[in-house]
Structure formats: structure tokens, C-alpha cells
Curated annotation (Swiss-Prot):
Lineage: Archaea, Methanobacteriati, Methanobacteriota, Methanomada group, Methanococci
Subunit and partners: Forms an energy-coupling factor (ECF) transporter complex composed of an ATP-binding protein (A component, CbiO), a transmembrane protein (T component, CbiQ) and 2 possible substrate-capture proteins (S components, CbiM and CbiN) of unknown stoichimetry.
Protein name: Putative cobalt transport protein CbiM
Functional pathway: Cofactor biosynthesis; adenosylcobalamin biosynthesis
UniProt keyword Cell membrane present: yes
Gene field: cbiM
Amino acid sequence: MHIMEGYLPPMWCAVWWVLSGIVIAYGIVKLKKLLEESPEMKPLVAISGAYMFILSSLKMPSVTGSCSHPCGNGLGAVLFGVPITAVLAAIVLLFQALFLAHGGLTTLGANDFSMGIVGPAAAVIVYRLCMKAGLSSTVGIFFAALFGDWLTYVTTAVQLALAFPIPSFTAAFTKFIVIYAYTQVPLAIAEGILTVIIWDYIKKLRPDLLLKLGVVPEEELKPYLTPSPAGGE
């Protein structure tokens, strides 16, 4: 989904930079506060960023002027929310633009808006809906990763169609989203399965962090929590 350097008109580069910049700035404040108040979260933040970096670096060429790849943004979004995920995505996108020729600096705002903001927002909403429906967090994280990936690409298709509405926005959007769908539908399913594996490992290894973040019900985490000396949970 990374839109390559120089592909978007300057006006659209500026628009997406401004919109993403606002969220990133807020995310930096939230991330700083989180790490100051809960320094034990640092490894989990690092894992979320690394997961996003690795998955989103596995790119396959696309004729849209972009590329297809997993996003890895659902995990961080569910754990820490959209603003912090926007910061992690910005760091990932900056490294990829500078060292992997993946994306670009002028298009970083657009790429962060899709992969660091809209996709994560979709992941958070879907995860919360799954929790309200009484589903397990494992099921919730699968669908969060799935829809986080899909909505990232829907957003990129919208961005490309807005920049190049030929012959119309609707026609351009349809063209871009159909091309993406061939690779992204199966990729998102695979990403969902991989995210479940990572999630269940975190749940078994550090259930205390998930409990502190309030993203998994205590009842679901009880089998993994270490009993106290008095025999309590």
C-alpha cells in the first residue's frame, strides 16, 4: 500500500501530511505518557513496531503505482490505540523510505494516514465490537488484523482515486480497489492468523500487561495469571 515517492501531486502530499501530522503529534504525547507511567510496556511497544515493520516490508509489486503487503497494524492498534500506532507507523515508514526504497518522504503522510490511522481505527472498532459480542480476544484480534489490513488498502485506493480521478473518482477507486483485492484478500487472512499466534503468545507470557491495558477481560486471562502466595489470582 506504500505510495511511492513523487507519485502524488504536491497538494495531496500536503493534505495527508497535515492530517497525519496532527495525529502523530498527539500520539507522541500519549506514547511519552504511557512509557513514563508504565515503563514495563516498552518491550510490548517495541514488539508492535517491529511486527509492523517486518510485515509491511514484505512487499509485492502492484500496477497501481503502489504495492501489496501485510500491514501488521492491528496488533499495536488494539494494544495501544490509534494515536500511538500512528507514531509507530511513521517510524516504520520513515525507515522503509530511507533504507528500503519503500514508499517515500513526500508520500509518508498519505501512507501513515492509511496504515497508521484509518487501518488501526478499523482494527480498534472491530476488536471492540467482537468483545461486546462476547467473543474471545483471540477471535477479536483475528478480525481486527483482517479489517485493519483491508481498510488500509481501501484508504489507499481512495487516496489514489482522489489524486487521479480518471475518468471519475468512482471509476478510479473501483479500478484501484479491484487490483488490490486480488492479493490483499488472502494476505489479510494470513496476517490475521499470524497475529493470532503472536497475540496468544503475549497472552500466555505477559497476561498482566494485557490486563493493565484493559484490552482482554480478566476472566479470559485467569488461566495465565500467576496465583499469589495466598492462593488468590
